[in-house]
């Protein structure tokens, strides 16, 4: 086994399905899967398949999603082996995927749970308050975003009473919030977020691009690989004749900001429009653009497909898409196919739906492909592709 993980050995946690597979074999299997899915679009003497970008094999995750079980005096942070049995809690505080700094933070959180009287939610009895702890770290400055997912606001006064003691033990510039999820269901978070700190974001930095992590906004969980993903996209387009471009499903702006910075170094009039449904992510992207002092950059909280289909402006020179697992879907793919944009960048965490979208992008040729091992020890991977309009 390439990682010493007692939880996998005992089959308590099998999230890393491929833990017994040598890392080189994992990469080869992912490459085979990717080539199989995109084989109809690989053109001889044209499509360049670049070597995969590897990940660290441990401590690569920046985020822990912990189900809280056990008792208020002895909380268990990890998973429930049986979703409906509150006695089946497995403590995963020693998971080898987490950053080393989490090792010191988890005991602090267990102590805080006891002091604030945050009784773990019992799914069988529908009683208790604390459902999950969500912990995210910035690799840039080691600050953390700590979110307590509670059934109600009932324990807020006790949490606030114990907060100064907690903050004194957490890294500088950390963010603490309560998320209220009242439903009796295995839903990770609710809509209400109550910040207990003045700061509401933690700052990450990839390739001198500041990126801001907020609650309820998507952020890649493997920062080392993510930073190389964004840098690669930037490198692919930096010398192209681009006046304006779209970043659809832009999240916190990782792709768009990297590309805008490189393009505006040569031509400050280059325009970027970034579109994302999550208002929280758009607030982060806007904050980054302001800090970078980029001009002609607009981020808007809209549905990416609806924006593209309804836009009556000048056609962009480049469109970047980074959709969720379902892909961009047929209507948007067909629209982009007819739009006639010279260049497309498609980043995907699901090559199967990407290949389906490629079928509708028949006016484009696949020029570059690179696999990024964002999710080691699993069958999942990220893939970055570059498509050009057929002449």
Curated annotation (Swiss-Prot):
Alphabetical UniProt keywords: 4Fe-4S, Iron, Iron-sulfur, Metal-binding, Methyltransferase, rRNA processing, S-adenosyl-L-methionine, Transferase
PROSITE patterns according to UniProt: SAM_MT_RNA_M5U, TRMA_1, TRMA_2
GO biological process: rRNA base methylation
InterPro entries the UniProt entry points to: 23SrRNA_MeTrfase_RlmC, MeTrfase_TrmA_AS, MeTrfase_TrmA_CS, SAM-dependent_MTases_sf, U5_MeTrfase_fam
Active site: 349
Keyword Ribonucleoprotein belongs to the record: no
Pfam hit, one: tRNA_U5-meth_tr
Catalytic function, reaction form: uridine(747) in 23S rRNA + S-adenosyl-L-methionine = 5-methyluridine(747) in 23S rRNA + S-adenosyl-L-homocysteine + H(+)
Domain of life of the native organism: Bacteria
Binding-site residues, [4Fe-4S] cluster: 5, 13, 16, 95
Coiled coil stretches, renumbered: none
Positions bound to S-adenosyl-L-methionine: 220, 249, 276, 322
Keyword Methyltransferase in record: yes
Enzyme class (EC, first level): transferase
EC number: 2.1.1.189
A GO term for molecular function: iron ion binding
Function: Catalyzes the formation of 5-methyl-uridine at position 747 (m5U747) in 23S rRNA.
Stated family: Belongs to the class I-like SAM-binding methyltransferase superfamily. RNA M5U methyltransferase family. RlmC subfamily.
Name of the protein described by the UniProt record: 23S rRNA (uracil(747)-C(5))-methyltransferase RlmC
Organism name: Actinobacillus pleuropneumoniae serotype 3 (strain JL03)
